[in-house]
Amino acid sequence: MNATLSHRRDFLKTTSSGFGYLAFAALAHQQALRANPAAGPLMPKQPHFTPRAKHVIFLCMQGAPSHVDTFDYKPKLIADAGKSAPSAAGRYGTAKLMPPQWKFGQHGKSGMWMSDLWPNLAKHADDLCMLNSMATDLPAHPQAFTQLHTGTTQFVRPSLGAWTLYGLGTQNQNLPGFVTINPPGNATRTFGSAFLPAIYQGTKVGGPAIPGLPAALGRRFAGGMDQATVANIKNSRFNTEAQRAQLDLVQSLNQSTMQQGGGVSAEVEGVIESYELAFRMQAEVPNVMDLTKETEATKALYGIGDGETETFGKQCLMARKFIEAGVRFIEITHGNWDQHFGLKAGLERNCNQVDKPVAALLADLKARGLLKDTLVIWGGEFGRTPHSQGDDGRDHNHKGFTMWMAGGGVKGGMNYGMTDDYGYEAVLNKMHIHDWHATVLALMGLDHERLTYRYAGRDFRLTDVYGSVAREIMA
């Protein structure tokens, strides 16, 4: 082996401990950036048509929130409580219809129905576009969660965030264009790039979100929701000057190798380019994630300082800061919405943790003039059954559930679609996950049929051969 090349590889091994995940996972394939900055894979790209939104914040509620207890008001479900469930044949046996466990009321000028679980979010009713006719293919968490993010229930495919970044690039070359805050454990498919270049996959911030775990257990098993940091963003072995000297020396070795006619490995050159960008990110990422400079009023707005809302409040505030810094796509995961039992206590706890921070995010974005350009999305992988499971729970329901959008060019104070009288199945303007993906891309200025990537001899797209845009919800 060429001695010079061997030395270069040694340098790469030592520097990788400081840049870690951030350098390799989020910043690969940067070979062309320095030679031709305009050709860099993350440089802003022209959309297919005029976008209504420039950024996305996806508030992902893992576990499947109960739509009939939150945003899908069903008077007949209340009237027929205790009767045998008409759609509960087979696996459900003699299940009984269970009414919503909280009262519903109308809010805003639009008169939008929302349950009492949302006292803060209800103040923003006229900003919300309720998608009451969502549907997906399977009532199983792993498959449905994968489909929510990638459009497929089983194959390894690029995620929604990766497709968005691939199609549009990002505004800040010193930050990742796709950030996922506290993604679930063992769920890299949900933020991965699959066959797209690795530069487009999400950069993970923190560990999985498991609300309700004691802090010690959270840190031990989940990384803790409060541990929202980028792994290895700082090099504990070398200061900035020493790192800069390392990179300069590696570049010098590159030049020496080229002058000797030995050539330069494209893979090694790409990694070095990643290091260069990661080096710049060391200064920018901590600044964006530093919440100490926020006013006390802003922290209080998000519920920071309150044990119940502290963690999710910090994450929502961090999302706003990433938006301000030019990041294209941010996802925040909040887990444990799978109430097969303990619905009353569990769903109330979940909503208490997210209601105030989500309302604060909408208010803060609007006050800063950012909401009009930012599409905020809330929802999970499917919904829950209108009938009971056990004494105090609801089972999975993939045929009809609710998500909502706000800002980013959607009509506020609107309910789109409808489920049947009990909330089992979408019966009007059904929005399958493929339709939802097509609509999100359209709001960002991307045609889901034209956003393709050629791999293994065929053109792939997020929506495969499906998907219709819900233009009725667009402002």
Label for each model-derived stretch:
Residues 1-475:
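Ligand-binding pockets and gating/stacking loops
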